[in-house]
């Protein structure tokens, strides 16, 4: 099914890392440009390289109901990359194990199927004890904003989350694949878009305000 709804809730809890209780208590970086991430080859990349650009940072998966979002993001990237928009893609396997491949396999899939040309980085965790420091910091800047109640997948997502953790709405945890953080040219996290947010109708206008 679209979101592998038949998966066991315990499996979901195990791989999602619902609670942030075990995450690093303090993320000392005060700017997004203080962070270093790993590219697909495991090499360090300083986010200071992206100073002055508008960024979308997104956790992704290749076997998810939201995977076609890649096409929407690529369309947005082609439209605005010459205006200094960058989309930084971080595959994550925490949500139902829907990003099972290696970084190179994921890249090959995305370029072949969706023509992706924006930067893709190494796989990360975004919740729990092993959460990447960048995503710990992003969640502290912008918490959960709620799903689009009109989206057809929202009832499925809320059902899964309710079973996994009745208090999921109260935490800043990333809830699913394709959660997007919008960063302005000064490095401020200005918006968080849940996976149900339409890229063309909701994300693109917010991006264009910053370009």
Spans of features found by a protein language model:
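N-terminal "domain-start" segment that seeds a small globular fold
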Residues: 15, 24-48
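Short loop/turn microsegments at loop-to-beta-strand junctions
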Residues: 32-33, 55, 177-179
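Conserved helix-turn-beta segment immediately C-terminal to the redox Cys motif
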Residues: 53-54, 62-63, 67-90, 111-114
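Thiol-based oxidoreductase modules, predominantly thioredoxin-like and allied folds used
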Residues: 84-101, 117-128
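Thiol/selenol-based redox catalytic cores and closely related redox-interacting motifs
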Residues: 109-197
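Non-catalytic, surface beta->alpha helical segment in thiol-disulfide oxidoreductase systems
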Residues: 191-211
């Amino acid at each position: 099914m679209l979101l592998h709804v038949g998966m066991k809730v315990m499996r979901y809890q195990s791989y999602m890392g619902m609670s942030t209780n075990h995450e690093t208590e303090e993320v000392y970086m005060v700017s997004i440009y203080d962070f270093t991430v790993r590219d697909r080859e495991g090499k360090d990349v300083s986010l200071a390289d992206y100073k002055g650009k508008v960024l979308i940072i997104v956790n992704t998966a290749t076997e998810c109901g939201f995977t076609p979002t890649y096409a929407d993001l690529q369309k947005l990237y082609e439209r605005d990359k010459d205006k200094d928009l960058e989309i930084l893609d971080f595959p994550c396997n925490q949500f139902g194990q829907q990003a099972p491949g290696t970084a190179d396999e994921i890249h090959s899939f995305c370029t072949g199927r969706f023509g992706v040309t924006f930067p893709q980085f190494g796989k990360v965790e975004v919740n729990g004890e092993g959460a990447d420091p960048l995503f710990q910091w992003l969640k502290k800047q912008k918490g959960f904003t709620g799903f689009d109640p009109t989206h057809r997948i929202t009832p499925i997502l809320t059902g899964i989350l309710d079973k996994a953790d009745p208090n999921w709405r109260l935490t800043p945890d990333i809830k699913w694949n394709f959660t997007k953080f919008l960063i302005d040219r000064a490095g401020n996290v200005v918006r968080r878009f849940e996976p149900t947010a339409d890229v063309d109708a909701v994300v693109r206008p917010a991006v264009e305000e910053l370009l």
